[in-house]
Amino acid sequence: MSDVTIVIPNYNGIAFLKTCLDSVLAQTGVQMDVIIIDNGSVDGSQEFISSNYPQCELVCLDQNYGFCRAVNEGINRAKSPYVILLNNDTEVRPLFAASLVASMKEDKSRFSCSARMLMYTKRDLLDDAGDFYCAFGWGIARGKGRPKQEYETADQIFSACGGAAIYQTEMVRLIGGFDEAHFAYLEDMDLCWRARIHGWKSWYEPDAEVFHVGSATSGSRYNRFKVLHSAGNNLYMIYKNMPLAQMLLNLPFLLVGFLIKYLFFVKKGLGKDYREGLARGFELCRKNKDRKVRFLWKNLPAYVAIQVELWKNILLFLPGRREN
């Protein structure tokens, strides 16, 4: 049995596939399987993979079902104890996979471990060193745009970034996998939040380096698609993972946070899209009540720890503050 399965979702990403797959297949120090889930690409991706990378398992879906459906397909096919999710617009270092596997083996309570993601064109700058979330309802990619030397230490994070992270295969299955109602955006944070409720940890491993282009599938950093899905998924994620008492406790913070976000997107010309996204979020909550995490008293210590972190992480947005 392989040590790890690398799952790569792809949608019309033929321009990135050679760089990504060549670097993946050059991994050392680990036995691995590679599964590529193609979301109905029409740019020749499927033919390119079949012709040039027969050692990879290619699964072709009939249309674009989004990130969550794609990676769930890969996770369900994985036969290894660990699964790595990797964006197609990446290039990984030779010890990327081995470093992630070693980190997970160090501590069996680790549900996930995020790689050190570096900008593809500015390779000394960070793209993501794990994700955080605060009581304002804001997520933050830790270290984005900072020199990579500032994040040399492995430590605990709120959530692994699903663009380059490793997970315990059986634990992902146990807590229900990625929620396909998300389609794309914040699905990785939702998954790690659920794991946190059950007492599991997410970690950051700087030795696992990956270079990331970013926004290769969806386009620019701020666009209608991203704003619409991110706003709705954020509201849905809060509803799913917070018991009623916790939602009420955070309501003043969330109202302020959502208002600030709305004003920000109004200035970007995307205010209408943000409102539509929130409306979509309420609809997701209504349609998926059965997916709300059931409160159990045994998980109360985890809820308390999460809440303290949500408050603490507000400080990360103050001027001059840097994430630890």
State each model region's role:
Residues 22-31:
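Short, acidic, metal-binding catalytic loop of nucleotide-sugar glycosyltransferases
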Residues 125-126, 138-140, 146-167, 189-191, ...:
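A recurrent flexible, glycine/aromatic-enriched loop bordering the glycosyltransferase active site
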Residues 61-78, 88, 99:
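Glycine-rich, basic loop-to-helix element that forms the pyrophosphate-binding segment
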Residues 83:
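Short aromatic/hydrophobic "clamp" motif used to bind/position activated sugar donors
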Residues 247-324:
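Non-catalytic, C-terminal membrane-associated alpha-helical segments of glycosyltransferases
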Residues 90-133:
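Conserved donor NDP-sugar-binding/catalytic core segment of glycosyltransferases
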Residues 23, 38-47, 63:
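A conserved acidic beta->alpha catalytic loop
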Residues 158-209:
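A short, conserved alpha-helix in the catalytic core of glycosyltransferases
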